[in-house]
Design a protein with these regions (language model features):
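Extended alpha-helical targeting/anchoring segments
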Residues: 1-216
Length: 216
């Protein structure tokens, strides 16, 4: 805790100095699986406890297993070149009773802080997509709409565009990566500060997973 509080203090100092406007500090928590437990069984349990539309399980050659349950679509591209990103910024827990749940949802929708942060991410993604999409095609189709999941309420926005005809999925992925939800804006200086303050490197945590198919 002391280490994390020190990181927060240093980030606040960077904000006061004008280096950044905000930062997304996190802590990586470590645990140990019981001997013999199949990581895929852990993933299946995760899907029960925290169902999400973009759940994924991946194993890599070094034996690492990655289990993810994310409600966020970072990027989508169909065969016609239509691009969509649905950033999330703004979160409240689900309530223990219907009345508490509704109150928490109203609080989130009415939060000026969460609305401002959501708008910042939308502006960042509009700029990112404009570099690889047809001129005039990038537009905000949803702004800070409330969406409720098993354990949380989120504010979700949607930005759409049409990919330039001479570009492909990899070009699209390069434009906004790493995601603005993690880096915030502007991107470069916050990433430099993360590398300085947050040991070890985040790796798959706060990263992204993708699937490329012939249908886009």
């Amino acid at each position: 805790r002391a280490r994390f509080e020190e990181m927060v203090s240093r980030v606040i100092a960077y904000i006061h100095a004008g280096d950044i406007r905000q930062a997304n500090l996190t802590q990586r928590l470590l645990g140990h699986l019981p001997a013999g437990l199949d990581p895929f069984m852990l993933y299946r349990r995760l899907r029960v406890l925290s169902p999400a539309p973009f759940s994924a399980f991946l194993t890599v050659p070094d034996g690492t297993a990655i289990a993810s349950a994310s409600p966020e679509r970072f990027l989508g591209l169909d065969a016609q070149g239509h691009v969509v990103t649905r950033p999330i910024k703004g979160t409240r827990p689900r309530g223990r009773t219907p009345a508490e749940d509704e109150a928490l949802a109203r609080e989130l929708v009415g939060s000026e802080k969460d609305q401002a942060e959501n708008l910042m991410i939308v502006d960042l993604l509009r700029n990112d997509l404009s570099r690889v999409c047809r001129l005039g095609s990038v537009a905000v189709s949803e702004l800070a709409e409330l969406e409720s999941f098993a354990n949380v309420h989120h504010l979700v926005s949607e930005v759409r565009g049409t990919l330039l005809p001479n570009l492909g999925p990899v070009d699209l992925l390069r434009a906004p990566f790493p995601g603005g939800l993690i880096t915030v804006a502007p991107k470069i200086r916050p990433m430099e500060i993360f590398n300085e303050l947050v040991p070890p490197r985040r790796g798959p945590y706060c990263g992204g997973m993708s699937c490329l198919g012939f249908d886009g």
